Amino acid sequence: MERLVATRLVTGLAVKIMRSNGVIHNANITSVNMDRSSVNVEWKEGEANKGKEISFADVISVNPELLDAVLAPTNVKENMPPQRNVSSQNHKRKTISKIPAPKEVAAKNSLLSESGAQSVLRERSTRMTAIHETLPYENEMEAESTPLPIQQNSVQARSRSTKVSIAEEPRLQTRISEIVEESLPSGRNNQGRRKSNIVKEMEKMKNKREEQRAQNYERRMKRAQDYDTSVPNWEFGKMIKEFRATMDCHRISMADPAEEHRICVCVRKRPLNKQELSKKEIDIISVPSKNIVLVHEPKLKVDLTKYLENQAFRFDFSFDETATNEVVYRFTARPLVQSIFEGGKATCFAYGQTGSGKTHTMGGDFSGKSQNVSKGVYAFASRDVFLLLDQPRYKHLDLDVFVTFFEIYNGKVFDLLNKKTKLRVLEDAKQEVQVVGLLEKQVISADDVFKMIEIGSACRTSGQTFANTSSSRSHACLQIILRRGSKLHGKFSLVDLAGNERGVDTASADRITRMEGAEINRSLLALKECIRALGQNKSHTPFRESKLTQILRDSFIGENSRTCMIAMLSPGFNSCEYTLNTLRYADRVKELSPQNAETNDDNLQMEDSGGSHASIEGLQLQDDFLLKDEELSTHNSFQDALNRVGELEDKAVDELRELVQKEPEWTNLLQMTEQPDYDLENFVMQAEYLIQERSKVLIALGDSINSLRLALQVEEQASKQISKKKRSNK
């Protein structure tokens, strides 16, 4: 049966096929393979041509009309195969029909055969004539399908001719003869026409394929022109650009409402700087909405296939590279200014990697090495303080405004408004933290504050890092204090934190760098825990773990305490690790899940940033990384050694200060000898007393110095252990 159906399957025939997903659509037969009982079909999908191989059985199952056409009887006369000998055609015509033709027809046929009918045959029409009264279904099939093989036509013609009823012979005889007369001479031309149509169709399909290939090649060339292949990591840049094309971004603007939070965590992305542009780095950070940040982390599979891992983080507010300092201030620090007039304590932090824009955000715009201090958060807050001070609801309070500006470097406090004098942090009898010797300067306008900012910024400690030749290596804190007489009414602390990338330099060969990294890490961890304790209303706040949190203790304790953190992000490809560390740090401060964020972009593939959210009580280094137990033990040993060094250093400095403070007694003793009638016995007694006291101090100082040296050796060994662990893990 399949062989019979195969006779109807010819090249160019339009059939229906079923895809693997169950979809049925039309396709054209391009070739027939009788040995494998299959056909090759081709169809157009979109702008591409596709094809597949289908068995005869599958074709019959989807196209049952082919089988019906083979089995059904028909009285339609089809075109006869062309023959070279016209007399043989007449013979076949008579034997196939088995119906005696009238004399006129016979005479006509004989006349045609004798008079050289070849020329007449070429002039006849090649149209096909069908008897619609007899088999309308088969006529419809013939009209829809493509021309069939010549052998098939002859076989079907014979089968149909034998089934003509004898009773219908007088009526059909003349009609059949006419059909035979018209079909037989046109057989040669029909065959040529069928072949030419198939060839034309194949050529048309070939031309379409060539055009499609040319179009695809042009697209590839155009796509290659869009990306500079000389740029490092251009493949990642291409993937990021294609991903961003699917996003529906909604940037934050000044028209959006400013929500008030007790703890507000925001993220700001800066644009690529000149150094990154010169290196042709790609931008790996996207801000699709006002509270979502995406990091396109470049990854490599085992087979070195490049792909992106898109990590999503949610915060209260997210600012892209187009946001100005004024926009950032409106949603971060501005809501906190009014709280200090109501007797509250507010704190605003700028956190992030060196070169991410912390000082730019807090201090103001840079033009070369000069800074415009009137365009930073410091200046905006100062203006709003004096604006609120003149309002009637606060004017009757008769408040005075004071400013302090200090820095914390290596756990030590220095006054930036008093020639960088070293300060001591102590607790008084009321268990309130006092910065002994900190200079508070009264100001009467915002311009006075600007001058203080310029003076303090010029004295701030800086150092060189891989990101910046002159990087701030200390935490700078500007405090705007409101006093009503001598009583504290409110305080706003604006803190520009040190770069967090030095927190991983605890294994450096340079002791100063190790100390910097350890102190920065210590203060940042303690700061995070204090903010979390404030947000979760914990009974214990670990503010004693660092000098920074110790000084800002009153900002973490109390119902009127409010905090805002601005996490600064560097978008460059080479800053991906530090950027993720910054985002994880900010995420753990408030722990907002990105899955709960409201966004209109359904195509965002947001993944949980991961990591444990367990609270860290005490000091653990490298909070930005998940450490194994043995690694954590090594870091704890280093931290213990570092704490011991700090304690012994403070002890030795105090003893030395005590020794220097007794220096006037020795001066007085010396001046006694210059008098002509001084009491020698009294001189001896005072000298012996001072020597004994000095001996005690010197012995104690000597012991402290020896202990400090041993502690430094222990710290050195602990640092080497960390270095070995890192090398073994690589």
From Swiss-Prot:
GO MF annotation terms: ATP binding; microtubule binding; microtubule motor activity
Subcellular location, record wording: Cytoplasm, Cytoskeleton; Nucleus; Chromosome, Centromere; Chromosome, Centromere, Kinetochore
One GO biological process term: microtubule-based movement
GO cellular component: cytoplasm; kinetochore; microtubule; microtubule plus-end; nucleus
Residue span of region Disordered: 79-98
InterPro entries: KIF2A-like_N, Kinesin-like_fam, Kinesin_motor_CS, Kinesin_motor_dom, Kinesin_motor_dom_sf, P-loop_NTPase
Family matches, as SUPFAM superfamilies: P-loop containing nucleoside triphosphate hydrolases
Coiled coil: 599-730
Region named Globular: 1-256
Keyword vocabulary terms for this entry: ATP-binding, Cell cycle, Cell division, Centromere, Chromosome, Chromosome partition, Coiled coil, Cytoplasm, Cytoskeleton, Kinetochore, Microtubule, Mitosis, Nucleotide-binding, Nucleus
Family as reported in the entry's similarity comment: Belongs to the TRAFAC class myosin-kinesin ATPase superfamily. Kinesin family. MCAK/KIF2 subfamily.
Function recorded in the entry: Promotes ATP-dependent removal of tubulin dimers from microtubules. Regulates the turnover of microtubules at the kinetochore and functions in chromosome segregation during mitosis. May play a role in chromosome congression and may be required for the lateral to end-on conversion of the chromosome-microtubule attachment.
Listed name of the protein: Kinesin-like protein KIF2C
